[in-house]
Amino acid sequence: MATIALPWSLSLYVFLLLLATPWASAAVKNCSHLECFYNSRANVSCMWSHEEALNVTTCHVHAKSNLRHWNKTCELTLVRQASWACNLILGSFPESQSLTSVDLLDINVVCWEEKGWRRVKTCDFHPFDNLRLVAPHSLQVLHIDTQRCNISWKVSQVSHYIEPYLEFEARRRLLGHSWEDASVLSLKQRQQWLFLEMLIPSTSYEVQVRVKAQRNNTGTWSPWSQPLTFRTRPADPMKEILPMSWLRYLLLVLGCFSGFFSCVYILVKCRYLGPWLKTVLKCHIPDPSEFFSQLSSQHGGDLQKWLSSPVPLSFFSPSGPAPEISPLEVLDGDSKAVQLLLLQKDSAPLPSPSGHSQASCFTNQGYFFFHLPNALEIESCQVYFTYDPCVEEEVEEDGSRLPEGSPHPPLLPLAGEQDDYCAFPPRDDLLLFSPSLSTPNTAYGGSRAPEERSPLSLHEGLPSLASRDLMGLQRPLERMPEGDGEGLSANSSGEQASVPEGNLHGQDQDRGQGPILTLNTDAYLSLQELQAQDSVHLI
């Protein structure tokens, strides 16, 4: 019996639950007479209207968030017949962000009846799905003309979540006309200014603006703003008197041309005006003579001469024909043998006994000194040669010459002095120079202390090439056999002791048969003189 009673009681419980469920869902979802809007910041405005007659004196709206621990309440006030409204203040400041898009509010309408408070309406509210912003404010005229006007406005209490989705509408009307006849202008972007055109001059207008957040197509337009009244400017009276504007431009152009030609005529005819203009337009340039008194007195106050080049222009142009430069001979490194210092047999004609000598033949081979790996190493002799071509003159005066068949004795330097000479390639007109003749080798002089020799002067004559004593002094060691080294040293020292220095010059003067090379001192030029003669062919 107990087992039959349990299923009967369970079925009765389920039946009662099914009956109660539709009533509860209807109480939650029935929001037809209650409208609430969120201004995206800290305010929820609600309006409640009912059809049935309720004997109530006071009603309130209660709001509770599912994510926040607060309850807000506002009292409904009668706005019009059977309509009540109130504002739920959610934050302490109007610009505070009180809700987000995930908040859900439970809103209830409770009224006081004779027996107590009774819940009349219950509704779930999603704030960001029911947005209605505050109406724009601070409308002002930025620029006004006869037919145009520029107007701006501001918006407030707008959340940063919906700022990119704002759009506006504006309407205008003639003062005294109805708003239903006004034209509406749509601004689909966040543009807080409006440029009105094609207005009537000297006419009064009124403008209103509203805003909406176009987010998920659920936004609602805000209320219209307070109307802005303005009046356009009257028409220009000059345009009515002179409607042809091109005539004014023509008169302006003619006036400019006449003024220009008048100024030119005055400047040409007035000869005293030029100095006056120079005085007026002159910039203050300081006098350099006040700061450089020495230079000013040296050049007589001539600034152009002071600033000019100290070298005349004629210095940079060649004054005569370009000299002929003889070819440069380059030898291989293997030719650095003793043959470079040998004189050929027919090197120079014999001098005359009268003391006159022929013109020396010089080349420019000693002017170039190369220090390359395989080149001939030459000590830098401070001797410069002219670039004149070689000219040989035969002495026509009476004098004896060597017979054609007589051989020239070779002039060889000592082994210790070979590096002191400026070595040149063998030529018919070769002339040897040495800055300083070094001391003879100890192999020639034994243990005798070396004596310094002074360099040959340009005005002194060279020793005779045919002097056999001098040839004996300059005979190289490498020409002697290997076993005669000691004998050569003894003979050399003996000859040096037996032959005095003055005897060498005496023998050269007594003999007139040895060839003598007399230096041509006119052929030697310093580097500055060479550059002064021909500055174009500088090396």
Swiss-Prot record:
Span(s) of short sequence motif Box 1 motif: 281-289
Listed InterPro entries: FN3_dom (IPR003961), FN3_sf (IPR036116), Hempt_rcpt_S_F1_CS (IPR003531), Ig-like_fold (IPR013783), IL2RB_N1 (IPR040951)
CDD domains (UniProt xref): FN3
Region Disordered, annotated ranges: 395-419, 440-465, 477-516
Principal location listed in the UniProt entry: membrane
Superkingdom of origin: Eukaryota
Keywords: Cell membrane, Disulfide bond, Glycoprotein, Membrane, Receptor, Signal, Transmembrane, Transmembrane helix
Domain Fibronectin type-III positions: 135-235
Disulphide connectivity of cysteines: C36-C46, C74-C86
UniProt-annotated location(s): Cell membrane; Cell surface
Motif window: WSXWS motif: 221-225
UniProt entry tagged with the keyword rRNA-binding: no
GO biological process, one term: cytokine-mediated signaling pathway
UniProt comment concerning the protein's domains: The WSXWS motif appears to be necessary for proper protein folding and thereby efficient intracellular transport and cell-surface receptor binding. The box 1 motif is required for JAK interaction and/or activation.
UniProt subunit comment: Non-covalent dimer of an alpha and a beta subunit. IL2R exists in 3 different forms: a high affinity dimer, an intermediate affinity monomer (beta subunit), and a low affinity monomer (alpha subunit). The high and intermediate affinity forms also associate with a gamma subunit. Interacts with SHB upon interleukin stimulation.
Protein family per UniProt: Belongs to the type I cytokine receptor family. Type 4 subfamily.
Free-text function comment from the UniProt entry: Receptor for interleukin-2. This beta subunit is involved in receptor mediated endocytosis and transduces the mitogenic signals of IL2. Probably in association with IL15RA, involved in the stimulation of neutrophil phagocytosis by IL15.
Protein name: Interleukin-2 receptor subunit beta
Organism this protein belongs to: Mus musculus (Mouse)
Name of the gene: Il2rb
